[in-house]
Amino acid sequence: EGATTTFNGNGGPRIGNIFSRLIYSIKFGSDQILFSDRVNADSQILYDRSPKERVAKVAPYLPLDGRVYPAVVDGRVKWIGDGYTTSSNYPYSQKTDLAEATQDSTTISSQTVQGLTDKEVNYMRNSVKATVDAYDGSVDLYTWDDSDPVLKAWQSIFPGQYHPMSEISGDLMAHMRYPEGMFKVQRQLLAKYHVTSASQFFSGEDFWQTPVDPTESKSEQSRDVLQPPYYL
Protein backbone atom coordinates (compact mmCIF):
# COMPACT_ATOMS: atom_id res chain seq x y z
CA GLU A 1 0.00 0.00 0.00
CA GLY A 2 1.41 3.39 -1.00
CA ALA A 3 2.33 5.93 1.65
CA THR A 4 0.61 9.31 1.68
CA THR A 5 1.50 12.65 3.18
CA THR A 6 -0.09 16.07 3.62
CA PHE A 7 1.64 19.23 2.47
CA ASN A 8 1.99 21.60 5.42
CA GLY A 9 3.78 24.48 3.74
CA ASN A 10 2.52 27.79 2.42
CA GLY A 11 3.36 27.35 -1.23
CA GLY A 12 0.49 28.95 -3.09
CA PRO A 13 -3.06 30.33 -3.09
CA ARG A 14 -5.66 28.22 -1.31
CA ILE A 15 -8.57 26.82 -3.32
CA GLY A 16 -10.69 25.47 -0.49
CA ASN A 17 -13.89 27.40 -1.22
CA ILE A 18 -16.19 26.57 -4.11
CA PHE A 19 -15.66 29.91 -5.87
CA SER A 20 -11.86 29.45 -6.01
CA ARG A 21 -12.26 25.87 -7.20
CA LEU A 22 -14.58 27.01 -9.98
CA ILE A 23 -12.20 29.77 -11.11
CA TYR A 24 -9.16 27.48 -11.18
CA SER A 25 -11.14 24.72 -12.84
CA ILE A 26 -11.91 27.12 -15.68
CA LYS A 27 -8.35 28.49 -15.75
CA PHE A 28 -6.70 25.07 -16.07
CA GLY A 29 -9.53 23.39 -17.99
CA SER A 30 -9.81 20.62 -15.39
CA ASP A 31 -13.09 19.50 -13.89
CA GLN A 32 -11.13 17.48 -11.31
CA ILE A 33 -10.33 20.66 -9.40
CA LEU A 34 -14.04 21.27 -9.02
CA PHE A 35 -15.34 17.74 -8.42
CA SER A 36 -12.48 15.67 -6.96
CA ASP A 37 -12.85 14.68 -3.31
CA ARG A 38 -9.07 15.09 -2.94
CA VAL A 39 -9.46 18.88 -3.07
CA ASN A 40 -10.36 20.10 0.40
CA ALA A 41 -10.33 23.26 2.52
CA ASP A 42 -6.53 23.13 2.88
CA SER A 43 -5.68 22.54 -0.79
CA GLN A 44 -3.32 24.94 -2.57
CA ILE A 45 -2.25 25.60 -6.15
CA LEU A 46 1.55 25.54 -6.38
CA TYR A 47 2.86 27.80 -9.14
CA ASP A 48 6.37 28.12 -10.59
CA ARG A 49 7.82 24.83 -9.41
CA SER A 50 11.24 25.44 -11.02
CA PRO A 51 13.76 27.01 -8.58
CA LYS A 52 14.95 29.46 -11.25
CA GLU A 53 11.39 30.55 -11.99
CA ARG A 54 10.72 31.21 -8.33
CA VAL A 55 13.84 33.36 -7.94
CA ALA A 56 12.99 35.22 -11.15
CA LYS A 57 9.54 36.04 -9.77
CA VAL A 58 11.08 37.52 -6.62
CA ALA A 59 13.93 39.40 -8.36
CA PRO A 60 13.17 39.71 -12.10
CA TYR A 61 15.97 42.25 -12.51
CA LEU A 62 18.69 39.69 -11.66
CA PRO A 63 20.24 37.61 -14.45
CA LEU A 64 20.49 34.10 -13.01
CA ASP A 65 23.16 31.49 -13.51
CA GLY A 66 22.23 28.60 -15.78
CA ARG A 67 22.77 25.96 -13.10
CA VAL A 68 21.07 25.52 -9.74
CA TYR A 69 22.04 22.65 -7.49
CA PRO A 70 20.46 20.95 -4.46
CA ALA A 71 22.05 20.63 -1.04
CA VAL A 72 20.94 19.49 2.39
CA VAL A 73 21.15 22.61 4.57
CA ASP A 74 20.23 22.53 8.25
CA GLY A 75 18.14 19.42 7.69
CA ARG A 76 16.21 20.76 4.67
CA VAL A 77 16.80 20.37 0.94
CA LYS A 78 17.65 23.73 -0.62
CA TRP A 79 18.24 24.65 -4.23
CA ILE A 80 21.18 27.06 -4.47
CA GLY A 81 21.71 29.48 -7.34
CA ASP A 82 23.70 32.56 -8.29
CA GLY A 83 22.43 35.98 -9.26
CA TYR A 84 24.44 38.54 -11.22
CA THR A 85 24.44 42.29 -11.46
CA THR A 86 25.39 43.48 -14.94
CA SER A 87 25.75 46.63 -17.01
CA SER A 88 26.65 47.47 -20.59
CA ASN A 89 27.86 50.99 -19.80
CA TYR A 90 31.13 50.44 -17.96
CA PRO A 91 33.72 52.85 -19.43
CA TYR A 92 36.60 51.59 -21.58
CA SER A 93 35.62 47.95 -21.28
CA GLN A 94 34.93 45.37 -23.97
CA LYS A 95 31.40 44.03 -24.20
CA THR A 96 30.78 40.29 -24.06
CA ASP A 97 27.75 38.40 -25.34
CA LEU A 98 26.65 36.34 -22.34
CA ALA A 99 24.70 33.78 -24.35
CA GLU A 100 27.66 33.12 -26.64
CA ALA A 101 30.23 33.02 -23.84
CA THR A 102 28.26 30.52 -21.75
CA GLN A 103 27.29 28.09 -24.49
CA ASP A 104 28.98 24.69 -24.41
CA SER A 105 28.09 21.00 -24.62
CA THR A 106 26.08 21.04 -21.39
CA THR A 107 23.81 23.90 -22.44
CA ILE A 108 23.23 22.29 -25.83
CA SER A 109 22.50 18.75 -24.66
CA SER A 110 21.15 19.23 -21.13
CA GLN A 111 17.63 20.20 -20.14
CA THR A 112 18.72 21.42 -16.70
CA VAL A 113 21.75 23.61 -17.48
CA GLN A 114 21.20 26.76 -19.51
CA GLY A 115 23.38 29.53 -20.83
CA LEU A 116 23.00 33.07 -19.58
CA THR A 117 20.57 35.55 -21.07
CA ASP A 118 21.21 36.89 -24.56
CA LYS A 119 22.66 40.32 -23.83
CA GLU A 120 25.96 42.15 -24.14
CA VAL A 121 27.60 43.40 -20.96
CA ASN A 122 30.95 44.79 -19.88
CA TYR A 123 30.30 44.71 -16.14
CA MET A 124 29.35 41.57 -14.27
CA ARG A 125 29.52 40.58 -10.61
CA ASN A 126 28.26 37.59 -8.68
CA SER A 127 26.59 39.74 -6.04
CA VAL A 128 23.72 37.50 -4.95
CA LYS A 129 23.27 33.96 -3.67
CA ALA A 130 19.74 32.60 -3.77
CA THR A 131 18.18 29.59 -2.06
CA VAL A 132 14.84 27.95 -2.74
CA ASP A 133 13.34 25.55 -0.21
CA ALA A 134 12.55 22.32 -2.03
CA TYR A 135 9.50 21.66 0.16
CA ASP A 136 7.57 24.90 0.29
CA GLY A 137 9.35 26.94 -2.40
CA SER A 138 10.30 29.83 -0.12
CA VAL A 139 13.03 32.04 -1.61
CA ASP A 140 15.85 33.72 0.29
CA LEU A 141 18.28 36.18 -1.29
CA TYR A 142 21.67 36.89 0.30
CA THR A 143 24.12 39.66 -0.54
CA TRP A 144 27.38 38.08 -1.63
CA ASP A 145 29.24 41.22 -2.72
CA ASP A 146 28.48 44.10 -0.34
CA SER A 147 30.64 46.54 -2.29
CA ASP A 148 28.73 46.22 -5.58
CA PRO A 149 27.13 49.62 -6.38
CA VAL A 150 24.53 48.07 -8.69
CA LEU A 151 23.30 45.77 -5.94
CA LYS A 152 23.24 48.69 -3.50
CA ALA A 153 20.96 50.53 -5.92
CA TRP A 154 18.57 47.58 -6.08
CA GLN A 155 18.62 47.29 -2.29
CA SER A 156 17.61 50.93 -1.96
CA ILE A 157 14.68 50.29 -4.31
CA PHE A 158 13.63 47.06 -2.57
CA PRO A 159 14.62 47.47 1.09
CA GLY A 160 14.44 44.33 3.17
CA GLN A 161 14.56 42.00 0.18
CA TYR A 162 18.08 40.76 0.92
CA HIS A 163 19.61 39.03 3.91
CA PRO A 164 23.17 40.12 4.78
CA MET A 165 25.97 37.65 4.20
CA SER A 166 26.37 37.33 7.98
CA GLU A 167 23.04 35.46 8.08
CA ILE A 168 24.35 32.64 5.87
CA SER A 169 24.64 29.63 8.16
CA GLY A 170 27.83 27.61 8.29
CA ASP A 171 26.00 24.64 6.80
CA LEU A 172 24.82 26.72 3.84
CA MET A 173 28.19 28.40 3.41
CA ALA A 174 29.83 24.99 3.09
CA HIS A 175 27.80 24.34 -0.07
CA MET A 176 28.54 27.65 -1.81
CA ARG A 177 30.67 27.36 -4.93
CA TYR A 178 32.05 29.46 -7.74
CA PRO A 179 29.35 30.29 -10.31
CA GLU A 180 29.68 28.36 -13.53
CA GLY A 181 28.37 31.08 -15.84
CA MET A 182 30.82 33.66 -14.55
CA PHE A 183 33.69 31.22 -14.96
CA LYS A 184 32.75 30.70 -18.62
CA VAL A 185 32.69 34.44 -19.26
CA GLN A 186 36.02 34.91 -17.51
CA ARG A 187 37.72 32.09 -19.40
CA GLN A 188 36.66 33.65 -22.71
CA LEU A 189 38.06 37.05 -21.73
CA LEU A 190 41.20 35.66 -20.15
CA ALA A 191 41.98 33.83 -23.39
CA LYS A 192 43.04 37.21 -24.81
CA TYR A 193 43.65 39.48 -21.87
CA HIS A 194 46.23 37.32 -20.14
CA VAL A 195 48.70 38.67 -22.72
CA THR A 196 50.72 41.51 -21.19
CA SER A 197 52.72 42.57 -24.26
CA ALA A 198 50.98 45.17 -26.42
CA SER A 199 52.64 43.96 -29.61
CA GLN A 200 51.70 40.33 -28.94
CA PHE A 201 48.16 41.34 -28.05
CA PHE A 202 47.51 43.30 -31.25
CA SER A 203 49.14 40.64 -33.40
CA GLY A 204 47.03 37.95 -31.75
CA GLU A 205 49.98 35.93 -30.46
CA ASP A 206 49.70 33.58 -27.52
CA PHE A 207 45.92 33.72 -27.35
CA TRP A 208 44.33 30.72 -25.66
CA GLN A 209 41.40 28.74 -26.95
CA THR A 210 38.75 26.77 -25.07
CA PRO A 211 38.91 23.18 -26.37
CA VAL A 212 36.12 21.41 -28.17
CA ASP A 213 34.39 18.81 -25.99
CA PRO A 214 36.10 15.48 -26.89
CA THR A 215 33.16 13.46 -25.52
CA GLU A 216 30.75 14.84 -28.12
CA SER A 217 30.01 13.22 -31.48
CA LYS A 218 32.09 14.13 -34.51
CA SER A 219 29.26 16.23 -35.91
CA GLU A 220 29.07 18.24 -32.68
CA GLN A 221 32.85 18.61 -32.58
CA SER A 222 32.77 19.94 -36.13
CA ARG A 223 30.42 22.67 -34.86
CA ASP A 224 33.05 23.65 -32.26
CA VAL A 225 30.88 22.73 -29.28
CA LEU A 226 33.04 23.74 -26.33
CA GLN A 227 34.07 21.64 -23.36
CA PRO A 228 32.26 22.71 -20.18
CA PRO A 229 34.03 23.54 -16.92
CA TYR A 230 33.60 21.09 -14.07
CA TYR A 231 33.95 20.98 -10.31
CA LEU A 232 36.53 18.82 -8.57
Task: Go through each PLM region and give its residues.
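Soluble extracytoplasmic regions of secretory-pathway and membrane proteins
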Residues: 1-232
